Amino acid sequence: EGWRIDKRLQTKYLDERIDDPKAALRAALAKKAQGVPWSIGVCCNATELLAVVRDAGVVPDLLTDQTSAHDMLIGYVPDGMTVAAAKALRERDPKAYLRESSRTVAKHVSLMLDLQERGAVTFDYGNNIRTEAREAGVAEAFRIKGFIPEYIRPLFCEGRGPFRWVALSGDPRDIARTDRLALTMFGDNASLRTWLEKAQQKIAFQGLPARILWLGYGERARFGLAVNELVAKGEVSAPIVFGRDHLDCGSVASPYRETEAMADGSDAIADWPLLNAMLNVASGATWVSIHHGTLRLRQAEGLRQLLR
């Protein structure tokens, strides 16, 4: 769906849109040769783009997938058809649609495995694509490792995670003030400084102005108190609301994402996020939410709705 790419162009998450996969690959390689960081959105099926990359003999440095493989009926689009054709098939014959999705996801993950074998650092983003591919006959799907055990868990073990705040005033200047505060308090953290400086230049706000940082629990507490002081002194024009991401330490029980490959075997133990929520409420938090959803339930519910 091209409008999704266009939105990311408007909000500065992408630099360019090229819908022909071969032309997009040529453009990306040209930018790489020039040493220019550049992001290109390609409006096509992921399998089509991966096949073009493989057939050209190109080995990506990094490879992952964020298609909606957690919902093979409503979210995932089989290859060889337009979005409109996919919608028509989904409504006319959902079982046939799921068969086409299963065929495509097997091809999809096989292409990823091929590129991994050639040297691309390949990881799963927790969207259930490995499970769907394995059920579609790709026995080695889990040779692709999850990004949490590979990269993120050491941060979680330190209590570090994504921490966000929103300017209820709607005034970007309030976020600019909190950015300066964060740089004053944590400016010795080189990656944090780089992120804040680049975010100010590159990332457009969507809705209320907001910012996100990866901070440790103690750092979050200190920063929250310091922002309270800004509000009390009138250095920002309205209160700031703080929240955290579902991707965080102690936030989600998800055996193929946040809690994949837990060292103590607790991948699918689901009660500790609830206990954490209760602790937050008892500690005086004013905004606590508990979300529920399983990958299989979502697909089954979507199918039931269509079959009514």
Question: Which functions belong to the PLM regions below?
Answer:
Residues 44-47, 66-71, 126-132, 244-249, ...:
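Glycine-rich beta-alpha junction loops
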Residues 46-52, 107-111, 224-229, 272-276:
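Short alpha-helical segments and helix-capping/turn motifs at coil-helix boundaries
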Residues 108-263, 301:
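Glycine-rich, aromatic-lined ligand/substrate-binding cores of catalytic
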Residues 1-34, 66-110, 143-155, 265-281, ...:
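Catalytic or ion-translocation cores adjacent to nucleophile or general acid/base/metal-coordination motifs
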Residues 41-67, 72-74:
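Active-site/ligand-binding-proximal alpha/beta "capping" segment
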